[in-house]
């Protein structure tokens, strides 16, 4: 059952998951010291999640799976952050989901959207594990036996970061939409806490415009072929 749901969500998550994020902005935000503290703490957690995704994508030998919106893998990636956690990208996503929830402190998001996110990613992970076990068999079993599913094994992480080259170009090409989304959500959440007059909203609007402009610029460079991820070694 979870595998079936996971395969469905793997195809449709880009359309469905953003709808859940809308619950972050339901209701009215009360400005208080507690709200500011929650915003700062939540932003830190969300940015940690984004940093996890950036490290995952930027380290050499790491290629994200998926073909034609179906679970797919050419090879079993066991290096980079995947040597410490089987699902570092999803770990990053979950940290971002938690961080947004802490920052917003919104009961609609915390009570409805966040549990749905957790269930959705549990199903997607189940679908991917089912596929990888069928494709790679014992190799995947051994990988699972020594590598945690989500909570990373920190032993040896420093050596991994030192010995693997980091590809910033790949990060920009592969991660710009997620980074743009993270910045937009945090700007909007901060606006609900800090904005009190037209000048504040003008500043927020300018930050949103610049973020979208940067995202559009990267997209155009990518589509034109002037910006690419470079070779995977």
What annotation goes with each model-predicted range?
Residues 90-94:
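Conserved beta-strand->loop/alpha-helix structural units within folded catalytic cores of enzymes
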Residues 85-86:
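Conserved SAM-binding loop
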Residues 1-82, 95-233:
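Membrane-anchoring alpha-helices and their flanking helix-loop junctions
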């Amino acid at each position: 059952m979870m595998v079936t749901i996971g395969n469905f969500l793997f195809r449709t998550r880009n359309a469905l998951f953003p709808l859940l994020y809308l619950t972050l902005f339901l209701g009215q935000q009360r400005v208080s010291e507690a709200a500011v503290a929650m915003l700062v703490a939540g932003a830190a957690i969300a940015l940690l999640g984004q940093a996890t995704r950036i490290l995952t994508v930027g380290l050499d030998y790491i290629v994200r799976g998926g073909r034609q919106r179906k679970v797919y893998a050419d090879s079993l990636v066991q290096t980079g952050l995947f040597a410490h956690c089987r699902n570092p990208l999803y770990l990053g996503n979950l940290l971002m989901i938690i961080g947004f929830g802490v920052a917003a402190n919104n009961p609609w998001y915390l009570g409805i959207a966040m549990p749905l996110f957790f269930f959705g990613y549990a199903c997607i992970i189940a679908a991917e594990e089912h596929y990888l076990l069928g494709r790679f068999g014992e190799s995947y079993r051994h990988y699972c036996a020594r590598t945690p599913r989500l909570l990373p094994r920190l032993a040896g992480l420093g050596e991994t970061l030192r010995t693997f080259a980091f590809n910033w170009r790949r990060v920009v090409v592969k991660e710009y939409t997620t980074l743009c989304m993270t910045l937009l959500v945090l700007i909007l959440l901060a606006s609900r806490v800090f904005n009190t007059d037209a000048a504040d909203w003008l500043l927020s609007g300018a930050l949103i415009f610049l973020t979208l402009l940067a995202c559009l610029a990267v997209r155009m460079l990518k589509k034109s072929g002037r910006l690419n991820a470079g070779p995977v070694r």
